[in-house]
């Protein structure tokens, strides 16, 4: 008999060799009917999996995230099945579930057309209606390679697997695919699916590899859920920062400038400047000192820091090591520069903590397939910072960093959109990370203890750390469901040693400090993208590039309009006036489309009484208000950063 610890805390005994499904059925027939997959010892698995030892087990139903992922993963295989039926010469790559659905990558001579997607969707529905059996089986490596001999991408994936790894397959009807699972027991419960679009994607995300065709889609148990999703997709398209940011003249791009190099237009630049001044002032209030460091450095500096060994492919290198006496590189991070500043003078324990802050322009050689609008770029501006602390100060300073980030998030109104990820190293990937298992384990244990003390609700993720230490990443999803890191806090165990950083403790002994890397508001470009999508371009007044627009009803009142502009501009308000000889209704509509928080209409009555007729985004037409009263209200709204 084996012991199975269930999610409710109970422990039950079962015969060894039962499947997860059989265990679910023994607990409840209803649970078995609704079961989609399981989680055994923290790892998602198939209901078909056999249990042969003591384990912890959670049964995941269709409405759980794990269940939704299993449904969509299964339907990605149905898509591949349909492709093989209709386009049998197509070669298969990979087909995972993603946050809002699934995709599958194909190698096909001619890209799929919109009509092809319609045919494939119809064929998928036909396959589901056939209700084919779904089987899982495993094969030794040689038999697996033989089975997949006509699928070059599958052969490559099999060869990438370690010698001891299990090679498993799923067979849906007459279609077999290499896959670790999990998959649903039957396609019958899946009542709604949609293929949403196709796009290009490099094999394994590497632009040196062949460009494949990626088909995206989604699936649900109910048509009503699909309808809701499709409505959300339409709303997401309206909010997409790539579309809206251009419409609102916040940024643009140009192929002559280059991919991943967005140009912030005056309005976008004003938002970033407002954020930057706010962050720098807030950091100064919290004891940060400002640095200003070069945009590039000799390769020698990056060799000390480890970037040359672990991050060189992500850097823009100026020169040739074999030909040039000196080789430079644009900086991907600020840390080695601020450490050099620290080493410019001796430090006592009384000097610590030192909190360095800098608004840094950084450069990273992102692959063309990774770049997206303002979210993934090759040049960006980071609210960077490094705290040099004693071991005793580490937890309190880490807490202080989090409090700063949480204050900024709450003010921006994005605190409820954030999730926390504890990013750890992969001990098998020594090319990516500094290879010091003892230091990694100690530092990760330290960070985990701090996070638990602070009661942070986080998930753990392997192979997501920085090369020099673990991270707490604050993750935010864009309108399309893709998750990106917005802010990060890292504990560095390596670079103090590499840069020979030290302080003199109270006993007069030389000690190594701890280092906390952090970004208080992240990359300004990425944060701007998230804010565009969060507010659909209708930013809070304090953040809006134009806070007030004055509209005279005719040119007779231009002088009064100009006096209103001067009065408010002298008080720091970002204000414009529209003096065009257009109908007032047209000018109001235009100002609304620009998401202007306040529109002030002025005519004879307003000029005579020193008033403005206010139209606000929140309350629409508010009527005439004394200019002084409106000014007081507006300045208070800006000062308090009201949303």
From Swiss-Prot:
GO terms for biological process: threonyl-tRNA aminoacylation. Zn(2+) binds at residues 335, 386, 517. PROSITE patterns: AA_TRNA_LIGASE_II, TGS. It comes from the Bacteria. Homodimer. Its cofactor is Zn(2+). This is Threonine--tRNA ligase. NCBIfam families: thrS. Residues 240-540 are annotated as: Catalytic. Its main location: cytoplasm. Belongs to the class-II aminoacyl-tRNA synthetase family. The gene is thrS. Disulfide bonds: none annotated. It is found in: Cytoplasm. Catalyzes the attachment of threonine to tRNA(Thr) in a two-step reaction: L-threonine is first activated by ATP to form Thr-AMP and then transferred to the acceptor end of tRNA(Thr). Also edits incorrectly charged L-seryl-tRNA(Thr). Residues 1-61 form the TGS domain. InterPro entries: aa-tRNA-synt_IIb, aa-tRNA-synth_II, aa-tRNA-synth_II/BPL/LPL, Anticodon-bd, Anticodon-bd_dom_sf, Beta-grasp_dom_sf, TGS, TGS-like. GO terms for cellular component: cytoplasm. Binds 1 zinc ion per subunit. It is an enzyme of class 6 (ligase). GO terms for molecular function: ATP binding; catalytic activity, acting on a protein; metal ion binding; threonine-tRNA ligase activity; transferase activity; tRNA binding. SUPFAM superfamilies: Class II aaRS ABD-related (SSF52954), Class II aaRS and biotin synthetases (SSF55681), TGS-like (SSF81271), ThrRS/AlaRS common domain (SSF55186). It comes from Clostridium botulinum (strain Alaska E43 / Type E3). Its EC number is 6.1.1.3. It catalyses: tRNA(Thr) + L-threonine + ATP = L-threonyl-tRNA(Thr) + AMP + diphosphate + H(+). Keywords: Aminoacyl-tRNA synthetase, ATP-binding, Cytoplasm, Ligase, Metal-binding, Nucleotide-binding, Protein biosynthesis, RNA-binding, tRNA-binding, Zinc. The keyword Membrane does not apply.
């Amino acid at each position: 008999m084996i012991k199975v610890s269930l999610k409710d805390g109970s422990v039950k005994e079962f015969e060894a060799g039962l499947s997860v499904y059989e265990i679910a059925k023994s607990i409840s027939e209803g649970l078995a009917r609704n079961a989609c997959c399981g989680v055994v010892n923290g790892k998602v698995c198939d209901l078909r999996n056999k249990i042969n030892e003591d384990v912890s087990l959670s049964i995941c139903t269709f409405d759980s995230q794990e269940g939704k992922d299993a449904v969509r993963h299964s339907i990605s295989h149905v898509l591949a099945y349909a492709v093989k039926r209709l386009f049998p010469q197509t070669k298969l790559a990979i087909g995972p579930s993603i946050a809002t659905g699934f995709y599958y990558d194909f190698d096909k001579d001619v890209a799929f057309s919109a009509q092809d997607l319609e045919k494939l969707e119809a064929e998928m529905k036909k396959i589901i209606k056939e209700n084919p059996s779904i089987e899982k089986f495993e094969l030794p490596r040689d038999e697996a390679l033989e089975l997949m001999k006509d699928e070059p991408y599958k052969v490559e994936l099999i060869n990438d697997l370690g010698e001891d790894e299990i090679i498993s397959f799923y067979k849906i009807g007459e279609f077999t695919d290499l896959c670790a699972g999990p998959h649903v027991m039957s396609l019958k419960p899946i009542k709604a699916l949609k293929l949403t679009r196709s796009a290009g994607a490099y094999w394994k995300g590497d632009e040196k590899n062949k460009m494949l065709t990626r088909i995206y889609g989604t699936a649900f148990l109910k048509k009503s859920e699909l309808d809701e999703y499709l409505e959300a997709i339409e709303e997401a398209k309206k909010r997409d920062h790539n579309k809206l940011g251009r419409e609102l003249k916040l940024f643009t791009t140009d192929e002559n400038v280059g991919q991943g190099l967005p140009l912030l237009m005056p309005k976008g630049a004003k938002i970033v400047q407002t954020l930057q001044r706010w962050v720098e002032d807030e950091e100064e209030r919290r004891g940060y000192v400002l640095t200003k460091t070069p945009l590039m450095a000799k390769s020698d500096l990056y060799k000390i820091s480890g970037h040359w060994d672990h991050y060189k492919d992500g850097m823009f290198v100026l020169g040739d090591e074999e030909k040039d006496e000196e080789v430079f590189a644009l900086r991907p991070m600020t840390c080695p520069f601020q450490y050099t500043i620290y080493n410019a003078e001796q430090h006592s324990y009384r000097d610590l903590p030192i909190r360095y802050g800098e608004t840094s322009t950084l450069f990273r050689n992102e692959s063309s397939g990774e770049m997206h609008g303002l979210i993934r770029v090759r040049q960006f501006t980071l609210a960077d910072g490094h705290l040099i602390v004693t071991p005793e100060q580490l937890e309190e300073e880490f807490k202080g960093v989090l409090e700063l980030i949480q204050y900024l998030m709450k003010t921006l109104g994005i605190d409820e959109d954030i999730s926390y990820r504890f990013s750890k190293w992969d001990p098998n990937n020594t090319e990516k990370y500094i290879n010091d298992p003892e230091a990694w384990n100690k530092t990760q244990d330290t960070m985990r203890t701090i996070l638990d003390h602070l009661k942070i609700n986080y998930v753990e993720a392997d192979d997501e750390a920085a090369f020099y230490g673990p991270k707490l990443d604050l993750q935010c999803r864009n309108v399309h469901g893709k998750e990106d890191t917005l802010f990060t806090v890292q504990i560095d165990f390596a670079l103090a040693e590499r840069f020979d950083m030290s302080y003199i403790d109270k006993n007069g002994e030389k000690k190594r400090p701890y280092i906390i890397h952090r970004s208080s508001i992240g990359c300004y470009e990425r944060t701007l993208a998230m804010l565009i999508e969060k507010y659909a371009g209708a930013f809070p007044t304090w953040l809006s590039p134009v806070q007030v627009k004055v509209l005279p009803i005719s040119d007779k009142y231009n002088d009064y309009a100009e006096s209103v502009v001067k009065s408010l501009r002298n008080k720091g308000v970002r204000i414009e006036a529209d003096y065009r000889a257009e109908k007032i209704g047209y000018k109001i509509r235009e100002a609304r489309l620009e998401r202007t928080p306040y529109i002030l209409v002025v005519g004879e009555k307003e000029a005579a009484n020193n008033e403005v007729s206010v139209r606000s985004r929140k309350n629409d037409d508010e009527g005439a208000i004394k200019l002084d009263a409106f000014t007081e209200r507006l300045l208070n709204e800006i000062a308090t950063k009201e949303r």
